[in-house]
From Swiss-Prot:
EC number per UniProt: 2.1.2.9
Keyword presence, Cell cycle: no
Molecular functions (GO terms): methionyl-tRNA formyltransferase activity
Gene: fmt
Protein name: Methionyl-tRNA formyltransferase
A GO CC term assigned to this protein in UniProt: cytosol
Stored InterPro entries: Fmt, Formyl_trans_C, Formyl_transf_N, Formyl_transf_N_sf, Formyl_transferase-like_C_sf, Met-tRNA-FMT_C, Met-tRNA-FMT_N
Family membership noted in the UniProt record: Belongs to the Fmt family.
Enzyme superclass (EC): transferase
Superkingdom of the source species: Bacteria
Ranges annotated as spanning the membrane: none
HAMAP family: Formyl_trans (MF_00182)
Purpose of the protein: Attaches a formyl group to the free amino group of methionyl-tRNA(fMet). The formyl group appears to play a dual role in the initiator identity of N-formylmethionyl-tRNA by promoting its recognition by IF2 and preventing the misappropriation of this tRNA by the elongation apparatus.
Catalytic activity, reaction form: L-methionyl-tRNA(fMet) + (6R)-10-formyltetrahydrofolate = N-formyl-L-methionyl-tRNA(fMet) + (6S)-5,6,7,8-tetrahydrofolate + H(+)
Length: 303
């Protein structure tokens, strides 16, 4: 099958690799190179780099909402468009430009966690099950019909990186199965109940509220690393918690109280045991390394 691919980050790479192996990728659309590092050198997106290595034509428009881009897509000899974490809204004229429309990989149990941050919200909300869906896109926000879906259980303390990799690889496999059977698949309309939205994360969400349960804070730590990160302030410095574990232990302390010299912190319910953290502008440290240089005394109440 002849394919136009639209995507940008690492999450989309396994799918493009599979398409290059099993189909004919006629063109790739991705976001423009961005300045990175101290030298602010322009860096291609992971998808741009992969397409470049395979000599696939790459386009980096600043928007899809103009006639020039729509005409370009119409001229590309393709049967279908695959869109994965592209970063731009796809207008109706492009959704309908090819025989089989536009397909999307969405890493959640739709209609739960529609929107920009399904992986993060899955972990933050403490979900114990999830899915990867192959969806035929329409003009709504992740409202299209489901062509193929695979459910799976989540490990209790899965990290964002682990869930990202699992869904990216599973989505790539499902995409190839979908394309192989696309003429025989009966699309399934998403149910109207159970709809939730996985809104984009904000930096403010990362500030710890010690009145929440230790379990909830641990979910946020795993779901918000690396960005925005979960943090507290101490001596006017921002400190990110990169890894912790929660203890379902009763206590009588005020929320936010440091109850041991190993940085165990009383929460609204339970206790958070910090294992790895990072002070602003410094490298990540284990709790042992951190406490050798920064002494957060027992009975301190963190804000």
């Amino acid at each position: 099958m002849k394919v136009i691919f639209m995507g940008t980050p690492e999450f989309a790479v396994p799918a493009l690799k599979k398409l290059i192996t099993h189909h004919e990728v006629k063109a790739v659309f991705t976001q423009q190179p961005k300045a990175k590092g101290r030298g602010l050198n322009l860096a291609k997106s992971p998808i741009h780099q992969l397409a470049f290595e395979h000599q696939i034509p790459v386009y980096t428009p600043s928007t899809l909402r103009n006639d020039e881009i729509i005409n370009l897509i119409n001229k590309v000899n393709a049967d279908i468009i695959v869109v994965i974490a592209y970063g731009f809204i796809v207008p109706k004229a492009i959704l309908e430009a090819k025989k089989y429309g536009c397909l999307n990989i969405h890493p959640s149990d739709l209609p739960r966690h529609r929107g920009a941050a399904p992986l993060q919200r899955t972990i933050i909300e403490g979900d114990r099950k999830s899915s990867v869906c192959i969806m035929r896109m329409d003009t709504g926000l992740d409202t299209g019909d489901i062509l193929m879906k695979e459910d799976f259980d989540l490990e209790e303390r899965i990290t964002l990186e682990e869930l990202h990799n699992k869904c990216a690889n599973l989505g790539a496999e499902l995409l190839i199965k979908t394309l192989a059977n696309i003429d025989n698949i009966v699309p399934i309309t998403q149910p109207s109940d159970g709809v939730t939205y996985a809104h984009k994360l904000t930096k403010a969400e990362g500030k710890i509220n010690w009145h929440e349960s230790a379990y909830k804070i641990d979910c946020k730590i795993r779901g918000m690393n690396p960005w925005p990160g979960v943090y507290f302030s101490y001596n006017d410095k921002i400190i990110k918690i990169l890894e912790a574990e929660y203890l379902n232990a009763d206590h009588h302390f005020t929320s936010g109280t440091v109850i041991s010299d190993k940085l165990e912190i009383a929460c609204g319910s339970g206790i958070l045991r910090v294992k790895k953290l990072q002070q602003e502008s410094k490298k990540a440290l284990s709790i042992e390394e951190f406490l050798r240089g920064t002494n957060i005394l027992k009975d301190t109440v963190l804000k």
